[in-house]
Amino acid sequence: GLETKFYEDFQKNDLEDVLKIDKIKIINFWASWCLPCEVEHPILMGLSKKSDFIIIGVNYKDTEEGSAEFLNEKGNPYDLVVIDDEGMMGIEMGLTGVPETFVVNEEGKIIYRIVGPINNENKF
C-alpha cells in the first residue's frame, strides 16, 4: 500500500486533497477509547489487503499515544491516518459518532455510509 502518512493538524484542504485521490476511498473514523472500533478492526485489516481502494483512518478526539498504541498492538490497516483531535473533520463530514465509515467514490462523493462498526455483511 501507500506509506501511512500522519496529518497532525487537520486542515480542510487536507480533506480536499484526500477526496481528490482517484480511487475509491474508505474513510473510517475511529478512536483508541472506542470499544466497537476494536470489534471492527480485524475486518479493516482484511480489507487493507485489497488494492482497489484506499483506507483512510481518521483518529477522532484521541491522544497520539492512545492511537499509536492501538495501531501498534492491533495492526495498521490505513493507507493514510488523519489526526482529528479537535473533531473538525468529523464536523465537516457530519459524523454522528465513532466508529463511522464513509465510502467516497473517485469523484469525491459519499456513496455509502456505515454508522457503527463494520461487519462482514457490509459489501466493499
Q: Where in this protein do the model-derived segments appear?
A:
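Conserved redox-active cysteine motifs that mediate thiol-disulfide chemistry
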Residues: 29-46
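A short beta-strand-turn-helix
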Residues: 1-25
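Conserved segment of the thioredoxin-like fold in thiol-based oxidoreductases
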Residues: 49-86, 98
